[in-house]
Amino acid sequence: MIELFSNGMNRSYDDFRKEADPKVQPLMDLLRKFCFTLGSNVVEDVRIHRVMFCKSFALRWFVDAEPQKDSILLKIQKSRGETQTVQLGIDQDLANIQALIREAYDSIH
């Protein structure tokens, strides 16, 4: 079950996706799908220019994905003081990024 968090703007992922560069849309979809496989408590917070994935409604985010022209800027947060920024290219292998995201998700209590 996909849970959505409304930030008052009632913006859906589909609305967000339409505004992203078509080159990065498939990669955003893959990242989104992966994040939801991490657990039933993953919450999606769709913002104007990015999508944040959080663990439960406590909204402890673990990944912030902001589409660029031909890449996605990812901020991966393992703890409140530890954020890693990664530029994910459209042809880049996702395995390493998925491992970082999983580690960040698992580190949130």
Regions found by a protein language model. Give the residues of each.
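Charge-dense, helix-prone N-terminal extensions
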Residues: 1-109
